[in-house]
Amino acid sequence: TMQAGLNEYLLYGGLPQILMYNTEEQKVRFLKTLFDETYIKDIKDRYNIRKDDDLEELINIIASNIGALTSPNKLANTFRSEKKSAVSYDTIKNYIDFLSDSFLVEKATRYDIKGKHYIDSPFKYYFMDLGLRNARINFRQNERTHLMENLVYNELRTRSFNVDVGSVSSVGTNSEGKRLRSTLEVDFVCNLGSRRYYIQSAYRMPSEEKLEQERASLLRI
């Protein structure tokens, strides 16, 4: 069924070789081996990385937080506060560049829709294959909402769209009459030539409240 196909894709990704394997064990083994013995080994060899603990931990953090706003500075702070490791901004940035150059992850930059300019930081990082992402964290943290967002991003990139993360601000008043500025996120601002689309990604719309929540930022554009 279509739902079964979607579930399979969200779990094992879209690499063609996956179709050669019939059992879950075979698919998991293939993805883990490909990630560790091909992608990561190539990165370590190509960039002569000898002390690889920080690289490995960075991959885990990004894989565990797909679709979350972050930056090299924020990641460096995470290493200092949670991992007790003083990894510099430059090292984090270099490692992320290595992952991007190896087609493991891709960065989506924030774009101020009303101001018509890019926002320097933070960004979002998406895995270019969900199966590799899931294999990296041992198929834990399979929240459908985040996986669907990553899937939609990948599909838009496959269709040659340039994809940014939208930010839209508005000014309103609270119950006391005070002016308040709020910022809402548009999941994707997609551009291809003269075409532009604004997209919200949601795995489920279980209620009218959820629908209104997803529409709120679009209605402010």
Annotate each predicted stretch with a short phrase:
Residues M2-G5, N22-K27, P206-S207:
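Alpha-helix capping and helix-coil boundary motifs
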Residues N191, R195-S207:
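Active-site ExK catalytic segment of metal-dependent nucleases
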Residues Y203-I221:
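Catalytic cores of nucleic-acid endonucleases
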